[in-house]
Amino acid sequence: MRDTSPFYITTAISYPNGKPHIGHAYELIATDAMARFQRLDGREVFFLTGTDEHGQKMQQTAKKEGISPQELAARNSAEFQNMARLLNASNDDFIRTTEQRHHEASQAIWMRMGEAGDLYKDSYAGWYSVRDEAYYQENETELRGDGVRYGPQGTPVEWVEEESYFFRLSAYQDKLLKHYEENPDFIGPAERRNEVISFVKSGLKDLSVSRTTFDWGIKVPNDPSHVMYVWVDALTNYVTATGCLTDPTGPRAKFWPANIHVIGKDIIRFHAVYWPAFLMSAGLPLPKRVFAHGFLLNKGEKMSKSLGNVVDPFNLVEHFGLDQIRYFFLREVSFGQDGSYSEEGIATRINSDLANGIGNLASRSLSMIVKNCDGQVPLCGPLTDEDKAMLAAADSLIGTAREEMGKQLIHRALAAIIAVVSETDRYFAGQEPWALKKTDPSRMATVLYVTAEVVRQVAILLQPFMPESAGKLLDLVAVPTDRRDFAHLGEAGRLVSGTPLEAPKPVFPRYVAPEA
């Protein structure tokens, strides 16, 4: 039975103290593919992305540049919004944590946690990483040969002492472990789930949730000398956008709890430990799933400004094409694991899967139809076992894709679609429609019909991953725009014989590297 309930999906909100890099683009592309998939499958989707604009790091970066944190946030948030447009992301909202609606929601969640008796004031002393915006215990840090102490993410930590509000995280250890046990799909993939459970079992200490040493943040209700620790503020964005706290009868309130938060593996602790504890305290339902993807490595190396190997998504898209880049990252990298990429790898994937694969299949079969079948979808005659097997493979793809996308295994959904393209290539070559043209024209027509029908279904299924290019493929087989959703896959949407087709234009040209 198809699920038609509302579907709420989020990316992590990006920290705009610098320009967007390919890691931000990767998360947005993957989340967009999942959102589009659910929309095409008939669900009402709310897809959120945005920027996390408060905190000490923003204040320090702004000071270095001689501008206010507001100016830095506005300038760089605009860059992230430009990236979303460039990547053809279908987000329904873009949240900025400096917005009034977010201040109201953050203060509402704070008040609820206070009313639950989970906030108290004390003084804090411990190791703090400005870059990670995280506190670490001494045993999580190491003093290196350069005389600097580093946290577990390899970022410098400093000793901080100040008055702070604390959240009674220690009171939620057993409740969290019970939730993980009763909801085995709450955290994915499995290695992240194991990592979180092991962290929680090792014992949770109460969490410092306010700061007094800087003021660029959301003021604590009734105590304006404190600003909220950035993670209380940042995580609340997911609730803010639905209005479920500030506008409980509003149009988006029904979307909470989120179906899935898509995040990077480096922030799993905040999303799978602190966030559910805050929500339990505030009496709000928990998200259904938190899925952490891996890092993108440039030729096997982690990208960093110091190595000078940070890749600008704008340049990559300009060089290879948008859908080509979307396809490469979603197909090449096992979603949930780290993935390595290189320009050579992108070029190879474009040429093998797209230009020589679906592009070539569509071009060859549709050119033959235009030339030999009066430019119309041919008549489908009696089907042989090979024809039936080919159509059955295409018809069953939606089941496989739903299953894999339901587990966030985007790469496997795409692999299944491309496997059917390869199978159709073999079918087409084996049937030799060019030879049948002389010996058995009606059989040629049936082979061409079957091939074009597979192209139709593959194109419908490729829409979440390559929206524009898949749309062009559907134009080639003259599928009306109101018959491009998943409800029209299989027999429900078969090509209609006699439908006029235009001569195909190549959708995926081969990539040829520019000469140095």
Curated annotation (Swiss-Prot):
| Gene Ontology biological-process entries | methionyl-tRNA aminoacylation
Q: Please describe what this protein does.
A: Is required not only for elongation of protein synthesis but also for the initiation of all mRNA translation through initiator tRNA(fMet) aminoacylation.
- EC number(s) per UniProt? 6.1.1.10
Subunit composition and interactions: Monomer.
Please tell me the species this chain comes from: Rhizobium meliloti (strain 1021)
- Which GO terms fall under molecular function for this chain's record? ATP binding; methionine-tRNA ligase activity
Amino-acid positions noted as binding ATP in the UniProt annotation, renumbered to this chain: 305
Renumbered to this chain, motif 'KMSKS' region spans 302-306
What is the gene name?
metG
Alphabetized UniProt keyword annotations: Aminoacyl-tRNA synthetase, ATP-binding, Cytoplasm, Ligase, Nucleotide-binding, Protein biosynthesis
Q: Which family does it belong to?
A: Belongs to the class-I aminoacyl-tRNA synthetase family. MetG type 2B subfamily.
Please provide one cellular component term from the Gene Ontology annotations of this protein.
Answer: cytoplasm
Location, primary (coarse class): cytoplasm
Q: Motif 'HIGH' region — list its residue ranges.
A: 14-24
- Report the locations given in the UniProt record: Cytoplasm
Any one Pfam family here would be: Anticodon_3
InterPro entries in the cross-refs: aa-tRNA-synth_I_CS, Anticodon_Met, Met-tRNA_synth, Met-tRNA_synth_2, Methionyl/Leucyl_tRNA_Synth, MetRS_core, Rossmann-like_a/b/a_fold, tRNAsynth_Ia_anticodon-bd
Q: Which reaction does it catalyse?
A: tRNA(Met) + L-methionine + ATP = L-methionyl-tRNA(Met) + AMP + diphosphate
Top-level taxon of the source organism: Bacteria
Identification of the protein by name: Methionine--tRNA ligase
